[in-house]
A protein has these predicted regions:
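Conserved N-terminal catalytic core of the sugar/cofactor nucleotidyltransferase
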Residues: 2-5, 13, 19, 26-27, ...
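Catalytic-core segments of class I nucleotidyltransferases/pyrophosphorylases
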Residues: 148-218
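Short N-terminal binding/cap micro-motifs at the start of the first secondary-structure element
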Residues: 11-16, 136
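The conserved acidic donor/metal-binding loop of glycosyltransferases
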Residues: 109-112
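Conserved donor-nucleotide/metal-binding helix-loop-beta segment in metal-dependent transferases, i.e.
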Residues: 114-137
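Short, well-ordered beta-strand micro-motif
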Residues: 27, 142, 170-172
Length: 218
């Protein structure tokens, strides 16, 4: 199993802390957010974590050294990849394209969670979601009668679903995701000037991949 952690965003919602410390390195309970995130994934995931790929901005050598140490502390190889322009979530994941091979978890670094993180051999894809009261500020998923995810809607203005994506995804075949991300880039499929991960997810479902929702307690 490999883990990709996109974390190049500015973290403006956590200012003033993020004026001096990148958002994922802001400490929560004595540990940086990103350390807690990947440690929780490693603890809950039954399959060993081989590699953790951090997608960063211009954070500097000391931050990169700290991130590699986080990976090493979990028994995984660490790697650094760069997203130097804010071109969206799909672009961020694609910045670590060489890691998209075999089973992959994508976990955006501003997410802290308590979740059911069980992955079975039959699972093609899992998106962890949380039921919320006001979904208009989030990306949400629609389910069919079998409980499978069939659509992704970003910040719905009319009610579509109350299941918000929390920013953690599992793909059994990372190469399949890489193909769809490359399609977005090649055809310049953008929204608001950014390449969005849900557009790649939608293409995967249209191609027959089955996503199921993972549950989050908090």
């Amino acid at each position: 199993m490999k883990v990709i952690v996109p974390m190049a965003g500015r973290g403006s919602r956590l200012r003033p802390h993020t004026l001096t410390i990148p958002k994922p390195l802001v400490p929560v309970g004595g540990k940086p957010i990103v350390h807690r995130l990947v440690a929780d994934i490693a603890r809950l995931c039954e399959e060993p974590i081989e590699q953790i790929a951090f997608v960063v901005g211009e954070f500097g050598a000391e931050v990169e050294k700290e991130l590699l140490a986080v990976a090493e502390s979990l028994g995984a190889k660490g790697s650094i990849h760069y997203q130097l322009e804010a071109l969206g979530t799909a672009h961020a994941v694609m910045c670590a394209s060489e890691v998209l091979d075999g089973p992959v978890v994508v976990a955006f670094a501003d997410t802290l969670f308590k979740a059911d993180f069980k992955i079975s051999a039959e699972d093609q894809g899992i998106l962890w979601v949380k039921q919320i009261e006001d979904p208009s500020a989030f990306g949400v998923v629609k389910l069919n009668e079998q409980g499978q995810i069939i659509d992704f809607v970003e910040k719905p203005q009319t009610f579509v679903s109350d299941l918000a994506m929390i920013g953690i995804y599992y793909f059994k075949d990372g190469a399949r995701l890489r193909k769809e991300l490359q399609y977005l880039l090649d055809h310049e499929i953008v929204k608001g000037g950014e390449y969005q991960l849900p557009d790649a997810l939608r293409r995967l479902t249209e191609d027959g991949l089955t996503f199921k929702p993972g549950t989050v307690e908090e």
